Amino acid sequence: MSTVINGRELADQMQAEIQKDVEKMTQQGIQPGLVVLLVGENPASQTYVRNKERAAAKIGILSKVEKLPETISEEELLAEIDKYNQDSRFHGILVQLPLPKHIDEEKILLAIDPKKDVDGFHPMNLGRLFVGKPEMIPCTPYGIMKMFEAYDIDLTGKRAVVIGRSNIVGKPMAQLLLMKNATVTIAHSKTEHLAEVAKEADILVVAIGRGHFVTKEFVKPGAVVIDVGMNRNQEGKLIGDVAFDEVSEIASYITPVPKGVGPMTITMLMYQTVEAAKKQK
């Protein structure tokens, strides 16, 4: 049986540390601030934003959610971003994705001041990460790296396979693993013989967005398995991309869904907001 990596517990420990940091800063007259721009009524987005608000309130970060209509024009949204770029009360700006079809996501992310891009999605921040000089790092892969650290999982010389190639998880995850001297393969839905490729991995990170897609046929016994998936099954239950029950029988470490990667993503968002406040003061 695997050791289950408890993301909720680790997130709580880290948030307690961040809270101490915020208390010190507040005594010096600096309160870290985060603004979230939420466009439309997407229920999943609303849940994520509520979780972010809750974490910010617990830690002592000033947080504001700017709810904007689904019909907002690109120009109006760009004007909102510009307003918060100029507002010194807010050290972090986050645009909750996905955006409505009529808005160019890339253009919106480019408009955020890179110093306030606490999600780490701005091309300048991704570029810094890829030349090995990171400033703001996408929060999900960053949180996963903290999990490896907390559980003393050594990455040097290990074979790592990342299933998923998004700019939010897959590509930055591969780069962070590379920076820790892992040998990295990026696979995806079009990879031939995907199960065989995955089975080579000592470290398997799955972010493909398909419920219970990775079964034990994909996993080498003793591998570390990180599940980034957030899917709903037919009963509406939250499930990961990995078939937890069967894979946990052969993996050495595994993250559950829920209470795995999700809480760490939010924690790293809070951490980067506080770090941004320190740099901007």
Swiss-Prot record:
UniProt-listed Enzyme Commission number(s): 1.5.1.5, 3.5.4.9
Single Gene Ontology MF annotation: methylenetetrahydrofolate dehydrogenase (NADP+) activity
CDD domains: NAD_bind_m-THF_DH_Cyclohyd (cd01080)
Residues annotated as binding NADP(+): G164, R165, S166, S189
Keyword Oxidoreductase among UniProt keywords: yes
Disulfide bonds: none
Entries under Gene3D superfamilies matching the protein: Leucine Dehydrogenase, chain A, domain 1, NAD(P)-binding Rossmann-like Domain
One record GO biological process: methionine biosynthetic process
Subunit note: Homodimer.
Protein name: Bifunctional protein FolD
Organism for this UniProt entry: Enterococcus faecalis (strain ATCC 700802 / V583)
